[in-house]
Amino acid sequence: MLKLGIFMMPIHPANKNLVDCLEEDRNLVIKADKLNYSEAWMGEHYSSSGEPVPSPFIFNASLISETKKIKFGTGVISLPQQHPAIVAGHAALFDNLSKGRFLFGVGAGGLVSDWELFDNLDGKTRALTMLDSIDAILSIWNSNCLLYTSPSPRDWTI
């Protein structure tokens, strides 16, 4: 059976009121749920006034109680911009709050302005950090202790 999903790339005019932008985007996901869409994906951008969602976790959490079946995806969490322990915790909490309606999408980031903001301009470093973050997140989820030493340029110890 064919399933429909929606990828939210909520591009809004820069001068549009932020509250109105977010409400419009929320209403779109609520409507998608009522139309039996199976999933809704929201991206993460910090430096774009046109895509005003720095946390898909928080945006999606605002919709849990207003929807019935739709699954919520992060499209994507930019791993080089965040500590993997924070991402692991937020993802696990969201999955539990949504009663399993969570789809975990990760990546190395897509906006040059975000790379500049977080001083992640080197593509090789971003890619290595992303891969290392995935290992760290899986290690956190699959163990009883939070001991992880990163081989990446970010040198995380958890």
Segments and roles (model prediction):
Residues L2-D20, Q81-L147:
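Flexible, glycine-rich active-site loops centered on histidine and acidic residues
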Residues Y148-I158:
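Single conserved hydrophobic/aromatic residue that forms the stacking wall/gate
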